[in-house]
Amino acid sequence: MKKENIYTDEELYWMTGGDAGCLPTRIIPSEIYSLAPNEVFVFGSNALGMHHGGAARIAYNEFGAEWGNGEGMQGQSYAIPTMEGEHNTMLAIGRFTRYAKEHPELKFMVTPIGCGIAGYTPEEIAPMLSEAASLENVYLPISFWKV
């Protein structure tokens, strides 16, 4: 049996309308161990799809990410390459946003893409996700919503 996803107290506070609903309630849990059939684990990758660590490794081990596939839908996960520079990351996020728009039946759980080994901060990545964040089926980390 899979472990349950874990939300921090802060995430739960905002998800339940904390502080008059200043932040959206579409917040991902800090620790994702399982997904519903319509949920997709969105993770940062490299263009070569070498899923060695972090969320990429979780996607590979748990949610069907394919070794050697650095972008797009794979199993119950979606890879966004974040290691090839800011411009390429923005383009990949644009492609993800189009895909999310085309699939309103899916719930996209976007991890803190780019904020691990790629070296970006939430302040750098969150604005790139502004269009995706407007979609009702896209859920983001609280660190991105707070930017």
Residues of each region from the PLM?
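Macrodomain-like recognition of ADP-ribose-binding/processing modules
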Residues: 2-147
